[in-house]
Design a protein with these regions (language model features):
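Oxidoreductase and adenylate-handling cofactor-binding alpha/beta cores
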Residues: 96-112, 137-140, 275-284
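Short acidic/histidine-rich motifs immediately flanking catalytic phosphotransfer sites
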Residues: 35-40, 56-60, 173-178, 205-208
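Glycine-rich adenosine-cofactor-binding loop
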Residues: 7, 88, 96, 115-136
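NAD(P)-binding Rossmann-fold cofactor-contacting core
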Residues: 10, 137-157
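N-terminal glycine-/charge-rich "phosphate-binding" loop or analogous flexible N-terminal tail
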Residues: 1-38
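Phosphate/diphosphate ligand-binding glycine-rich loop within oxidoreductases
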Residues: 39-112
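Rossmann-like adenosine-cofactor binding region
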Residues: 49-50, 150-249
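Rossmann-like dinucleotide-binding domain for NAD(H)/NADP(H)
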Residues: 207-388
Length: 389
């Protein structure tokens, strides 16, 4: 059996070669000729999988190691009898840590305190729920907006008083910060294409901090630029871009943090994407999933951090700890440097930065040894995912 896997799927060769002859190809470059004799296709979001790619091939199963599916033509799969899977939640913690790092970066750079700020989380699924938890750990007030879930349930699972969903108008009127974690939905009552449009920003609280680590087309780029120019929006974090990999340089030049769709690219997040697809392929084939990723996992890059707390604000200490584990500013710098190439090179560099992304480990693999520090600081670090001594 022939299998093709896209690059940027850690341990794909190790996992899928236990099932058949496996090749690794650059995701955006996979063509119909590459998959004509292939039965299993495992990939990420850079590969558009549709009739043009698959018609006339032997492909029986498509698995994407991502939480999104807008790159898959599912209606064609159903028509052609092709089974498929995705990896919901595989990188949810990674994205929530990216948002945490961004919040601390902005707060320390611009001199404001996160505690007491109101953050609106639009989309409270696998990612959004973790963002809510970490925002609360930082002492923020959280407004949750998720119309599909609100129709199904009036409260979150624990039925706590702080776990009610609110409508978008309330989020826009009250939130100091808004972060978006929705799927890309092109039509219907829950359409998210250009969710953040001119009306969205006009209704927002003046000086809004806006963050998008969902999908690029969720944001109307001209509307965002106008909101920045008019002072409606003060600071922006963008990890996803309209038209990516051919993103707009004028948008990049105006945002505080610009990264090339890597919020979910922690090593653990990518590995779990591979694992989830591998297990679904095994289920499809009716064979036991005997391969395990555990023996292949490398030691953490930053196993321990020792921090002197005396005389420093908790937020400054938190920023230092997070920065040592995840160099967000480095991601921003590399992306901006890559944009200096000519247009064709700039577009290629977007994919290159993603496929050759440096190893980033999640907070849970780092122990923080605090010299001093309050019980509150220790609790926050634990709630963010760190081990604390």
């Amino acid at each position: 059996m022939d299998i093709v896997c896209a690059t940027n799927m850690p341990f794909a060769m190790e996992a899928f070669s236990t099932l058949g002859s496996t090749r690794i190809l650059e995701g955006r470059d996979i063509k119909a000729a590459d998959v004509r004799e292939v039965e299993i296709l495992a990939l990420r979001s850079t590969t558009k999988v549709n009739r043009a790619l698959l018609e006339g091939s032997k492909v029986r199963f498509v698995g994407t190691a991502t939480i999104g599916t807008d790159h898959l033509d599912i209606s064609y799969f159903d028509q052609a009898g092709i089974k498929w899977c995705f990896a919901p939640g595989c990188n949810a913690n990674s994205v929530s840590e990216y948002i945490t790092a961004s919040l601390l970066f902005l707060a320390c750079k611009h001199g404001f305190t996160l505690e007491g700020k109101t953050i609106g989380v639009i989309g409270v699924g696998n990612v959004g729920r973790r963002v809510v938890q970490k925002a609360r750990a930082l002492g923020m007030q959280v407004l949750m907006n998720d119309p599909p879930r609100a129709r199904q349930e009036s409260r979150m699972e624990d039925n706590g008083p702080d776990d009610r969903f609110v409508d978008l108008d309330q989020v826009l009127a009250e939130a100091d910060i808004i972060t978006v974690h929705v799927p890309l939905t092109k039509e219907g009552p829950d359409k998210t294409v250009h969710l953040a449009d001119a009306s969205f920003f006009e209704r927002a609280k003046k000086g809004l901090i806006f963050m998008n680590a969902a999908r690029g087309p969720v944001v109307d780029s001209p509307a965002l630029l106008n909101a920045l120019a008019g002072g409606k929006v003060s600071h922006v974090v963008l990890d996803t871009w309209e038209g990516e990999p051919d993103y707009r340089l004028d948008v990049m030049s105006k945002v505080d943090i610009a990264t090339p769709h890597i919020a979910g690219h922690s090593f653990e997040g990518k590995v779990m994407g591979t694992v989830m697809v591998y297990r679904e392929v095994c289920r499809f084939l009716g064979v036991p999933a005997t391969w395990s990723h555990e023996p292949f996992m490398p030691a953490p890059l930053v196993p321990c951090i020792r921090v002197e707390v005396a005389g420093r604000q908790d937020q400054v200490v938190l920023r230092e700890v997070v920065r040592q584990v995840y160099d967000l500013a480095g991601d921003d710098r590399r992306f901006r440097d890559s944009a200096l190439a000519d247009n064709a090179g700039r577009i290629r560099n977007f994919d290159r930065l993603r496929s050759h992304y440096p190893e980033r480990r999640e907070f849970q693999y780092t122990t923080v040894k605090l010299i001093g520090g309050t019980p509150s600081l220790r609790r926050i670090l634990k709630d963010l995912g760190f081990k604390v001594e």
